[in-house]
A protein has these predicted regions:
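Solvent-exposed loop/turn and edge beta-strand elements of beta-rich ligand-binding domains
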Residues: 1-181
Length: 181
């Protein structure tokens, strides 16, 4: 490097990160004694200001949580990731970057019907979240953004319909006609 003043300034940050606005100034001099000049630039640590989305899954109209529901997150770059609810009916998508996001339920345990609602929201560069759309019916997907910026999604599923057939049989396992239940 030539003798003089060197300025270092970040001009573009990776997607999902903030630009470090500090300007670093380094003066390069020579003592003319022939020795090498070494300067180490230590990259400053800029904490990522990421957001998380907490999801809680329950049976419609009850406080019964549902384990094993799978949710899909489509990121702003079009890639997808999935998470599965735990024994508390909870799961989390971490590190939501800037741009538009889509959340949908992709599978549930056999005794439930998949909620076909889709929630779309946008994370701005100042980490504010705006809900773009929610196609769920009957408030079955409730998206909330708290004052501290925390995002949560509460999702309800209904039980799948089923038919119960009861047969009365004798001791030889032969069906008996005319029994009423």
């Amino acid at each position: 490097l030539p003798i003089g003043t060197l300025t270092i300034q970040e001009t573009q940050a990776p997607e999902g990160y903030l630009i470090n606005s500090e300007v670093y100034v380094v003066k390069i001099t020579s003592s003319n004694d022939g020795s090498d000049f070494v300067y180490t630039y230590n990259e400053p640590e800029i904490p990522e200001q990421s957001l998380d989305l907490n999801i809680v899954k329950k049976e419609k109209g009850k406080d019964y949580v549902i384990e094993g529901a799978v949710f899909e997150h489509t990121k702003p770059d079009g890639t997808t990731e999935t998470v599965t609810t735990d024994e508390k009916g909870a799961c989390k998508f971490k590190g939501l970057g800037y741009g538009q996001h889509t959340i949908r339920e992709v599978s549930v345990p056999d005794e439930y019907i998949v909620n076909d609602g889709v929630v779309t929201f946008t994370v701005a560069e100042d980490n504010t979240i705006t809900i773009d759309s929610n196609t769920a019916t009957g408030n079955s997907m409730q998206f909330k953004v708290e004052a501290d910026g925390t995002a949560s999604l509460s999702v309800e599923d209904t039980l799948a319909p089923y038919t119960l057939k009861v047969l009365k049989a004798n001791e030889k396992d032969v069906a008996l006609e005319g029994a009423e239940f």
